[in-house]
């Protein structure tokens, strides 16, 4: 059995091509546990999680990456946010009924794939592409073609392992500033395309690579753990409250007695009473956390 929730990087010794392989189970489960989603939405979030992990691993700096789908369909928003430490969180917004067999275009409708890269140092970058492909992987390949101009292929699989949702994926990309032959890259992509969900989700990474590339020389590097981690906090909520007009905050306090701020990603609630608000306005730290 593979060690799920790990990202593996690998290189081909005889080709200027790099690869990544990731499988997720517990991370995906934690994202899904916070909400009740129809199965097609769960599948989209699983694919987005895999894609975000793979894309984050291509970054050469510390920072965040957000991959989101948005459109006018019943799935108005699906987003995964991750960072270079492979810490992930995600959420979806559903409006209207979703058939069990809904595909990506049925779910999102007329929409876009938006990728936002935010380095800890440097300028923020955002790329937007229309949903012209039939799958998320195809849309992401279109993004790379338009923005990175590096030949890139993604292979994403979803399923269940021991009754729990799981997902996996592989990425192939020509090394920057290298002259990989197109036929070599296409050959490796054809091999990778043959990976089955069961193989990717149940076999160790080295076994997967052997099945796909046993005639090639491949170097597999130490894995990086993938985990669910939400960045919400009481302090961030306090900062958000401070940006609201005083009269709006006071009106909520008068009606409700306290302000309940809810994190869509992890489900935490942060409660603020009148004393907390007074301390926020005085630039003091709010009273002891009230989280449930």
Swiss-Prot record:
The keyword Chaperone applies. Under oxidizing conditions two disulfide bonds are formed involving the reactive cysteines. Under reducing conditions zinc is bound to the reactive cysteines and the protein is inactive. One of its GO terms (biological process) is protein refolding. Disulfide bonds join 230-232, 263-266. GO terms for cellular component: cytoplasm. SUPFAM superfamilies: Hsp33 domain (SSF64397), HSP33 redox switch-like (SSF118352). The keyword Zinc-finger does not apply. InterPro entries: Heat_shock_Hsp33 (IPR000397), Heat_shock_Hsp33_C (IPR016154), Heat_shock_Hsp33_N (IPR016153), Hsp33_helix_hairpin_bin_dom_sf (IPR023212). GO terms for molecular function: protein folding chaperone; unfolded protein binding. It is found in: Cytoplasm. PANTHER family: 33 KDA CHAPERONIN (PTHR30111:SF1). Redox regulated molecular chaperone. Protects both thermally unfolding and oxidatively damaged proteins from irreversible aggregation. Plays an important role in the bacterial defense system toward oxidative stress. This is 33 kDa chaperonin. It comes from Salmonella choleraesuis (strain SC-B67). The gene is hslO.
């Amino acid at each position: 059995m593979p060690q799920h929730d790990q990202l593996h990087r690998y290189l081909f010794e005889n080709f200027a091509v790099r690869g990544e392989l990731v499988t997720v189970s517990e991370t995906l489960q934690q994202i899904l546990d916070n909400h009740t989603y129809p199965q097609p939405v769960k599948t989209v979030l699983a694919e987005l999680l895999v894609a975000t992990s793979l894309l984050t691993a291509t970054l050469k700096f510390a920072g965040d990456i957000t991959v989101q789908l948005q459109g006018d369909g019943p799935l108005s928003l699906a987003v995964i946010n991750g960072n270079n430490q492979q810490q992930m969180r995600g959420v979806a917004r559903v409006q209207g009924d979703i058939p069990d067999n809904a595909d990506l275009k049925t779910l999102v409708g007329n929409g876009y794939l938006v990728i936002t890269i935010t380095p800890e140092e440097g300028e923020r970058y955002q790329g937007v592409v229309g949903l012209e492909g039939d799958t998320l992987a195809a849309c992401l390949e279109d993004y790379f073609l338009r923005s990175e101009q590096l030949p890139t292929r993604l292979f994403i699989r979803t399923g269940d392992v021991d009754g729990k949702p799981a997902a996996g994926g592989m990425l192939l990309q020509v090394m920057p500033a290298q002259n990989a032959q197109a036929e070599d890259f296409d050959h490796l992509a054809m091999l990778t395309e043959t990976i089955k969900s069961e193989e990717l989700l149940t076999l160790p990474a080295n076994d997967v690579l052997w099945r796909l590339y046993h005639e090639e020389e491949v170097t597999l590097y130490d894995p990086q753990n993938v985990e669910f981690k939400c960045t919400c906090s009481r302090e961030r909520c306090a900062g958000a409250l401070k940006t609201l007009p005083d009269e709006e905050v006071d009106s909520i306090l008068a009606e409700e007695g306290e302000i309940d701020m809810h994190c869509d990603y992890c489900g935490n609630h942060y409660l603020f009473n009148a004393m907390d608000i007074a301390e926020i306005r005085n630039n003091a730290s709010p009273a002891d956390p009230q989280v449930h």
